[in-house]
Each structure stands twice: as structure tokens, then as C-alpha cells.
Amino acid sequence: MVDRFDRFVAIDWSGARGKRHKSISLAVADGSGGPPVIVEQNKGWAREEVLAILLDLPDRTLVGMDLGIGLPFADCGAFFPGWSDSPADAKALWALIDQICADDPNLEATSFVKHPVASCYYRHSAGDCGEQFHLPDAPTREGRFRVTERAQRDQGVRPVSNFNLVGAAQVGKSSLTGMRILNRLRGKVSVWPIDLLPDSGPVLVEMYTSIAAMGGGARKGRTKLRSYEALNEALAVLGSPPVRGSGPLDDHSSDALVTAAWLRKVGNDPRYWHPERLTDEIARTEGWTFGVP
């Protein structure tokens, strides 16, 4: 595992509608050292442009994307309980979403969240909650969670259900558009742990940027680094040189920068590739968040 990766890419993702997005941010940290750097795109990134980059990665690249690579499955043995078309595993889920959204522009996922059956599993707004958003015996009204998300709570972070499409916590849209990307990477980029960690070739993992920030010393509940000074404090903890700049910094850029530096620090550590609670079945269906033990 030593020196398996020498290039570390972090992508702060967005599921918003539209062609270009200032909220998508890419950062790269080189294994030989130096500060992480933002890959500039002044007009905002298009999802198709990010896909093109991912399809042309050097072999020893580790990519972390801030999205969910799967949906809850272990809690009731299905992504969409009661739906005859519910896929059997994560790769079939990606393919189903991409198929249903084939006519959506900009790799969006509007058709899936408006699908007559799939829509029933999502919270669409404060007053529009699908009848399948909660399981009948759900202990809370937060929606369903994957095993890795329940484990994240043990780390002190607060993940949101991937079936939630509401407001700033609408991780569901980011995950759905991301799954369209993942479906198009099949056979070209390994997606851990849904794919086994290969001996060579680029690898993509799911990231929760709060975990990276906490790795840089950020306190629980205060993981958004909204100034160059706060970012550089975290980078110092991660053994990285500082980035240039002072004053306010948008959190899309800071999330990507601190995550790239964190991936460089831990990406070649075998312990991070063997989470205690990850089973073959969970890997095949729900996936896992890199950095969750």
C-alpha cells in the first residue's frame, strides 16, 4: 500500500440545476509536497467538464468526492422497499438513475426525483414529504441512513439522509447527479468500496468534508473554514504548507483544499481502507465514506 497514490484530488460537488456551478470546486495536492491548489474555472464548472477530467486521470490518483455513492439499503434490504424496480446493488442503482434521467440536461437528476414511484421516497420540501421517506417504525423524522452515516454520527458529525432534497442540506440532489457520473466511470475508475481497491489505476472515494476538516483540527460542529487563516491552520495540522491569501474564503474552495491535503496525509495508510463495520454486503449496496472507521 506504500506509495499507492501520488496525486490527490478533492471535489466539492453540487446537484443544483443549470450548466455551470460556482459551488463545484476542485483541488489537487501533489504527493511530493507543496500546498494544495484550486483548479480554476472562472465561469464555474460544468458537470460534464468534471466527468472529462475523471475519465483522464493519471493511474496513481486518489479522488475524493463530496457526495453519497449509494443509498440506504441495510435497514430494510432494499433501496426502495416495495418498488418492483428497486435495484439489487449500487451499480444497478447508478444505471437506473442515469437511464431515467437520460434526457435531463447538464447531468441533472430532475427526472428521477419527479418519477411517479421514486419521488415517493424523497423529502422534496418542508411541506412535501414522500410517503416512503420514513420507514413505518422510524425512530426520528430525519429519513433513512446508511450504516456509514450512522457511524459518522459516532464521530461527532451530522450527516443528512440522501433522500433529503431540502435546502442547504439537499445532499440527495448532489448524490443523484454524482451517481450519473459514477455510472459513466464504470470500467475506467474504481469506486471504493463498491469496487475492490485495485493494485493500479485511479480510485474514487466518497468524502464528507467535515471529516477532513476535523482531521485538520477543526472542532465538531465548526468544520467550515471560511477564511484563509482558518484554512492554513488546518493545513498546518495536516503537514501541508499554507496557501497564499488572507481574509474571507468561500467554503467550497476551503472544503476542497483541506480535503485534498487530508487525502494526501491518510490516503496511503492501510488502516483507512479497512473500516471495522464495512462488510461485503454493505460495500456492494450502500458503499462507505472514506475516513469513517
Residue ranges of model-derived segments:
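RNase H-like (RuvC/DEDD) metal-dependent nuclease/polynucleotide-processing core
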Residues: 2-9, 13-293
